[in-house]
Curated annotation (Swiss-Prot):
Its main location: membrane. It is a multi-pass membrane protein. It comes from the Eukaryota. Induction: Expression is down-regulated when the stress-activated mitogen-activated protein kinase (sakA) is deleted. This is Lolitrem B biosynthesis cluster protein S. The chain crosses the membrane at residues 73-93, 112-132, 157-177, 219-239, 250-270. Belongs to the ltmS family. It comes from Epichloe festucae (strain Fl1). Residues 1-27 form the signal peptide. The lineage of its organism: Eukaryota, Fungi, Dikarya, Ascomycota, Pezizomycotina. Part of the gene cluster that mediates the biosynthesis of lolitrems, indole-diterpene mycotoxins that are potent tremorgens in mammals, and are synthesized by clavicipitaceous fungal endophytes in association with their grass hosts. The geranylgeranyl diphosphate (GGPP) synthase ltmG is proposed to catalyze the first step in lolitrem biosynthesis. LtmG catalyzes a series of iterative condensations of isopentenyl diphosphate (IPP) with dimethylallyl diphosphate (DMAPP), geranyl diphosphate (GPP), and farnesyl diphosphate (FPP), to form GGPP. GO terms for cellular component: membrane. Keywords: Membrane, Signal, Transmembrane, Transmembrane helix.
Length: 283
């Protein structure tokens, strides 16, 4: 195993540990095996239990009802969370499953879903990324997608998730400039960088707990997904006896910072595949 492999595997271990410590310090369970019936139970007991569940649905029906009942207080980050999550899951399925293997796509999605259901997305993404980094070497990175379809797929993810990420932050920034006293639901301190104090604002403490856990999952899980793609890019370069340059790393970091981890991941894979495919075409 190369030095860069160790670096990216260590990064995934760091994200996994960071997610566990972060959740533990804020009172969320590290491992949870809730009853499946709680997905359809909207009783008060289930709603109370939902304050600590790690899965992004947190008893999906109850959580969505809680978000709806609390109006716009938690909508902005939820939209950001869903866009990044969907984009990264599609990228992971693209990387782990050859084109057209729908059953294997379902198996990979089910494995990631069960891990997230029991240990939370902030832990599941790093664990899943560790498996990918250990199983897929550079010579196996490019899937059987036709080149035109692959570029269209990655560019679609890049633009859709990137525009949503930038647009959501623009809404939060405008709301912050218009309401500097942090009383607006879309204020960046209430929506993206933190959660509102529901003892002072008209929102539910349970919904705030859900939102805080989504923020933990989004910050650690999506960072894990982005560095997974950077690790795969590094493997592809090593197969060509090349290494990541400082200029390329700075570019990848700023794309991820501005357009979001999902768009950053798509950009990394487009860059990687342009290198590996071009050599095959020349050969």
């Amino acid at each position: 195993m190369s030095r860069s492999d160790w670096i990216f595997i260590s990064l995934q271990g760091f994200f996994c540990l960071a997610g566990v410590i972060w959740k533990s310090r804020e009172g969320y369970p590290i491992i949870d095996f809730p009853c499946p019936l709680q997905f359809i139970d909207s009783s008060d007991a289930t709603l109370s239990y939902g304050t600590t569940s790690p899965w992004f649905g947190f008893r999906a029906v109850a959580s969505m009802q809680s978000i709806w009942d609390n109006g716009p207080w938690f909508w902005l980050h939820l939209m950001l969370y869903i866009a990044q999550l969907v984009g990264l899951i599609l990228i992971i399925l693209h990387e782990t499953v050859p084109h057209g293997a729908f059953l294997r796509k379902f198996e990979s999605l089910a494995a990631l879903g069960y891990l997230s259901y029991t240990v939370g997305l902030s832990t599941a993404f790093p664990v899943f990324s560790l498996w990918i980094l250990n199983q897929y070497r550079a010579e196996k990175l490019v899937t059987a997608w036709p080149r035109r379809q692959e570029k269209a797929f990655l560019r679609t993810i890049f633009w859709c998730t990137g525009i949503s990420h930038i647009g959501i932050f623009m809404v939060a920034i405008v709301a912050t400039l218009l309401h500097r006293d942090a009383t607006a639901p879309f204020h960046i301190g209430n929506s993206l960088l933190g959660v509102p104090d529901c003892s002072q604002f008209p929102c539910s403490e349970i919904a705030a707990r859900h939102a805080r856990l989504r923020q933990i999952n989004e910050m650690t899980g999506t960072s894990s997904g982005f560095f997974l793609t950077v690790g795969l890019f590094s493997q592809a370069l090593e197969a060509e006896n090349k290494h990541l340059s400082l200029r390329v790393m700075v570019r990848m970091f700023f794309v991820s910072l501005i357009a979001g981890p999902a768009a950053g991941s798509a950009d990394v894979l487009l860059l990687r595949d342009s290198i590996t495919r071009s050599k095959k075409d020349c050969g």
